[in-house]
Protein backbone atom coordinates (compact mmCIF):
# COMPACT_ATOMS: atom_id res chain seq x y z
CA UNK A 1 0.00 0.00 0.00
CA UNK A 2 1.46 3.39 0.87
CA UNK A 3 1.45 6.27 3.30
CA UNK A 4 0.17 9.78 2.63
CA UNK A 5 0.29 12.51 5.28
CA UNK A 6 -0.99 16.08 5.18
CA UNK A 7 -0.11 18.73 7.76
CA UNK A 8 -1.29 22.33 8.03
CA UNK A 9 0.48 24.92 10.18
CA UNK A 10 1.34 28.63 10.03
CA UNK A 11 -0.12 29.44 6.60
CA UNK A 12 1.38 26.34 5.00
CA UNK A 13 -0.24 23.06 4.00
CA UNK A 14 1.81 20.07 2.90
CA UNK A 15 0.94 16.67 1.46
CA UNK A 16 3.71 14.08 1.43
CA UNK A 17 3.72 10.49 0.21
CA UNK A 18 6.14 7.63 -0.11
CA UNK A 19 6.94 5.92 -3.40
CA UNK A 20 6.36 2.23 -2.83
CA UNK A 21 4.02 0.28 -5.08
CA UNK A 22 3.39 -3.26 -3.86
CA UNK A 23 1.71 -6.24 -5.45
CA UNK A 24 0.96 -8.63 -2.62
CA UNK A 25 4.22 -9.06 -0.76
CA UNK A 26 6.39 -7.86 -3.65
CA UNK A 27 7.69 -4.33 -4.17
CA UNK A 28 6.97 -3.47 -7.81
CA UNK A 29 8.26 0.11 -7.80
CA UNK A 30 9.97 2.30 -5.26
CA UNK A 31 9.72 5.80 -6.73
CA UNK A 32 6.06 6.31 -7.61
CA UNK A 33 4.71 9.84 -7.26
CA UNK A 34 1.43 9.64 -5.35
CA UNK A 35 1.15 13.35 -4.59
CA UNK A 36 0.41 16.03 -7.15
CA UNK A 37 -0.89 19.52 -7.72
CA UNK A 38 -4.29 20.10 -9.32
CA UNK A 39 -6.40 23.04 -10.47
CA UNK A 40 -3.83 25.66 -11.47
CA UNK A 41 -1.48 24.51 -8.66
CA UNK A 42 -4.00 25.66 -6.01
CA UNK A 43 -4.97 22.19 -4.78
CA UNK A 44 -2.76 19.40 -3.47
CA UNK A 45 -3.83 15.76 -3.70
CA UNK A 46 -2.41 12.42 -2.62
CA UNK A 47 -3.71 8.88 -2.92
CA UNK A 48 -3.45 5.52 -1.25
CA UNK A 49 -4.78 2.36 -2.83
CA UNK A 50 -4.78 1.03 -6.35
CA UNK A 51 -2.67 3.19 -8.66
CA UNK A 52 -4.91 2.93 -11.72
CA UNK A 53 -7.95 3.56 -9.52
CA UNK A 54 -6.33 6.63 -8.03
CA UNK A 55 -5.48 8.12 -11.42
CA UNK A 56 -9.10 7.67 -12.47
CA UNK A 57 -10.18 9.49 -9.31
CA UNK A 58 -7.61 12.26 -9.82
CA UNK A 59 -9.01 12.88 -13.30
CA UNK A 60 -12.59 12.91 -12.03
CA UNK A 61 -11.72 15.17 -9.11
CA UNK A 62 -9.86 17.62 -11.34
CA UNK A 63 -12.92 17.76 -13.62
CA UNK A 64 -15.09 18.55 -10.58
CA UNK A 65 -12.66 21.30 -9.53
CA UNK A 66 -12.92 22.85 -12.99
CA UNK A 67 -16.71 22.55 -12.93
CA UNK A 68 -16.94 24.25 -9.52
CA UNK A 69 -14.22 26.90 -10.08
CA UNK A 70 -11.81 25.30 -7.62
CA UNK A 71 -14.22 25.09 -4.67
CA UNK A 72 -12.63 22.17 -2.82
CA UNK A 73 -15.45 21.04 -0.53
CA UNK A 74 -18.14 21.18 -3.21
CA UNK A 75 -15.91 19.33 -5.68
CA UNK A 76 -15.12 16.66 -3.08
CA UNK A 77 -18.79 16.13 -2.22
CA UNK A 78 -19.72 15.86 -5.89
CA UNK A 79 -16.93 13.33 -6.50
CA UNK A 80 -18.03 11.32 -3.46
CA UNK A 81 -21.63 11.28 -4.74
CA UNK A 82 -20.45 9.98 -8.11
CA UNK A 83 -18.17 7.46 -6.42
CA UNK A 84 -21.13 6.06 -4.47
CA UNK A 85 -23.62 5.92 -7.32
CA UNK A 86 -21.57 5.09 -10.43
CA UNK A 87 -21.16 1.33 -10.94
CA UNK A 88 -17.67 1.61 -12.38
CA UNK A 89 -16.43 4.05 -9.73
CA UNK A 90 -17.86 1.96 -6.88
CA UNK A 91 -15.35 -0.76 -7.72
CA UNK A 92 -12.37 1.58 -7.38
CA UNK A 93 -10.28 1.03 -4.27
CA UNK A 94 -8.45 4.17 -3.26
CA UNK A 95 -8.50 7.01 -0.75
CA UNK A 96 -7.76 10.62 -1.62
CA UNK A 97 -6.36 13.36 0.58
CA UNK A 98 -6.94 16.83 -0.86
CA UNK A 99 -6.07 20.28 0.45
CA UNK A 100 -6.15 23.91 -0.56
CA UNK A 101 -5.33 27.12 1.29
CA UNK A 102 -8.39 26.75 3.54
CA UNK A 103 -9.42 23.11 3.86
CA UNK A 104 -8.00 19.59 4.13
CA UNK A 105 -10.22 16.58 3.35
CA UNK A 106 -10.24 12.81 3.05
CA UNK A 107 -12.45 11.39 0.28
CA UNK A 108 -13.30 7.69 0.61
CA UNK A 109 -14.77 5.10 -1.71
CA UNK A 110 -17.77 4.84 0.59
CA UNK A 111 -18.76 8.35 -0.40
CA UNK A 112 -17.49 9.95 2.78
CA UNK A 113 -15.87 13.38 2.82
CA UNK A 114 -14.15 13.96 6.15
CA UNK A 115 -12.54 17.14 7.42
CA UNK A 116 -9.99 15.98 10.00
CA UNK A 117 -9.17 17.30 13.44
CA UNK A 118 -5.92 19.15 14.11
CA UNK A 119 -5.48 19.96 10.39
CA UNK A 120 -3.76 16.59 10.11
CA UNK A 121 -4.57 13.73 7.73
CA UNK A 122 -2.80 10.41 7.24
CA UNK A 123 -3.97 7.46 5.15
CA UNK A 124 -2.66 4.17 3.85
CA UNK A 125 -0.88 1.26 5.45
CA UNK A 126 1.46 3.52 7.42
CA UNK A 127 -1.16 6.19 8.04
CA UNK A 128 -1.63 5.47 11.74
CA UNK A 129 2.11 5.67 12.38
CA UNK A 130 2.47 8.89 10.40
CA UNK A 131 -0.54 10.44 12.11
CA UNK A 132 0.72 9.61 15.60
CA UNK A 133 4.17 10.99 14.81
CA UNK A 134 2.79 14.15 13.19
CA UNK A 135 0.38 14.81 16.06
CA UNK A 136 3.20 14.49 18.61
CA UNK A 137 5.34 16.89 16.57
CA UNK A 138 2.46 19.36 16.15
CA UNK A 139 1.78 19.38 19.87
CA UNK A 140 5.36 19.46 21.11
CA UNK A 141 7.50 21.34 18.61
CA UNK A 142 7.53 24.49 16.52
CA UNK A 143 8.55 22.62 13.36
CA UNK A 144 7.02 23.75 10.08
CA UNK A 145 4.29 21.77 8.34
CA UNK A 146 6.88 20.64 5.78
CA UNK A 147 9.28 19.39 8.46
CA UNK A 148 6.50 17.60 10.34
CA UNK A 149 5.20 15.88 7.21
CA UNK A 150 8.69 14.76 6.22
CA UNK A 151 9.62 13.47 9.69
CA UNK A 152 6.30 11.67 10.22
CA UNK A 153 6.61 9.96 6.83
CA UNK A 154 10.15 8.87 7.71
CA UNK A 155 8.90 7.38 10.99
CA UNK A 156 6.06 5.57 9.21
CA UNK A 157 8.52 4.12 6.67
CA UNK A 158 10.74 2.87 9.50
CA UNK A 159 7.79 0.92 10.92
CA UNK A 160 5.54 -0.06 7.98
CA UNK A 161 6.88 -2.61 5.46
CA UNK A 162 4.55 -1.24 2.76
CA UNK A 163 6.03 2.28 3.02
CA UNK A 164 9.49 3.31 1.82
CA UNK A 165 11.80 6.30 2.29
CA UNK A 166 11.27 7.81 -1.20
CA UNK A 167 9.23 10.97 -0.65
CA UNK A 168 7.17 13.22 -2.88
CA UNK A 169 6.27 16.42 -1.06
CA UNK A 170 4.09 19.27 -2.28
CA UNK A 171 3.38 22.44 -0.31
CA UNK A 172 1.15 25.47 -0.56
CA UNK A 173 2.00 28.69 1.24
CA UNK A 174 -0.84 31.12 1.72
From Swiss-Prot:
Activity-regulation annotation: Allosterically activated by HslU binding.
Residues annotated as the enzyme's active site: 2
One Pfam assignment: Proteasome
Enzyme nomenclature, EC number: 3.4.25.2
Chain residues that bind Na(+): 157, 160, 163
Enzyme class: hydrolase
GO molecular function, one term: threonine-type endopeptidase activity
Subcellular location: Cytoplasm
GO cellular component: HslUV protease complex; proteasome core complex
Chief place of localization: cytoplasm
Keywords: Allosteric enzyme, Cytoplasm, Hydrolase, Metal-binding, Protease, Sodium, Threonine protease
Biological-process GO terms, alphabetical: proteolysis involved in protein catabolic process
Catalysis performed (reactions): ATP-dependent cleavage of peptide bonds with broad specificity
Top-rank taxon, per record: Bacteria
PANTHER family reported for this sequence: ATP-DEPENDENT PROTEASE SUBUNIT HSLV (PTHR32194:SF0), METALLOPROTEASE TLDD (PTHR32194)
Known partners and oligomeric status: A double ring-shaped homohexamer of HslV is capped on each side by a ring-shaped HslU homohexamer. The assembly of the HslU/HslV complex is dependent on binding of ATP.
Entry's family note: Belongs to the peptidase T1B family. HslV subfamily.
HAMAP family: HslV (MF_00248)
NCBIfam families xref list: ATP_dep_HslV, PRK05456.1
Function according to Swiss-Prot or TrEMBL: Protease subunit of a proteasome-like degradation complex believed to be a general protein degrading machinery.
UniProt protein name: ATP-dependent protease subunit HslV
Originating species: Shewanella baltica (strain OS155 / ATCC BAA-1091)
Amino acid sequence: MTTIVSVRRNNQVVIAGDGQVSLGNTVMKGNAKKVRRLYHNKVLAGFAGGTADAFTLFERFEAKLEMHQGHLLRSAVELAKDWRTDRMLRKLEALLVVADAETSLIITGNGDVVQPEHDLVAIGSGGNYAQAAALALLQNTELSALEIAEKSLTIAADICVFTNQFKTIEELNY
